[in-house]
Swiss-Prot record:
Reaction(s) this enzyme catalyzes, per UniProt: Endonucleolytic cleavage of RNA, removing 5'-extranucleotides from tRNA precursor
Name this protein carries in UniProt: Ribonuclease P protein component
E.C. number: 3.1.26.5
Summary of subunit composition and partner proteins: Consists of a catalytic RNA component (M1 or rnpB) and a protein subunit.
InterPro entries: Ribosomal_Su5_D2-typ_SF, Ribsml_uS5_D2-typ_fold_subgr, RNase_P
Keyword Nuclease among UniProt keywords: yes
Gene this protein is translated from: rnpA
Keywords linked to the UniProt accession: Endonuclease, Hydrolase, Nuclease, RNA-binding, tRNA processing
Amino acid sequence: MSRGFGREKRLLTPRQFKAVFDSPSGKVPGRNVLLLARENDLQHPRLGLVIGKKSVKLSVERNRIKRQIRETFRHHQLELAGWDIVIIARKGLADLDNPELAKQFAKLWKRLSRNPAKTAAEPGAANNTHA
């Protein structure tokens, strides 16, 4: 598999985004960001970014954040094969510098690839298994 970030590695249409939003099989919350993931039938992952003006005001910052996310995704895509992933930015994401962003997303990718079944559970659900 190529480590590039071509068209086939992106979520492009509203229908593709809607499929992930409507029925995510994994959720990974992070600091100032939320990852929604859904399994796909492909041999590679696909990425979609939702970074609005409300959460990141300046276009320069939005573009910087998108570049950093795409770059970390490119390096971790072998671990993420078979996922459609949507990243939703929240306020405060622009306050992180590039190394902090890269570090945060490396952890988020690892959490998603390592334990997809648990990420789909609600935050308190894992603790209630012995009830």
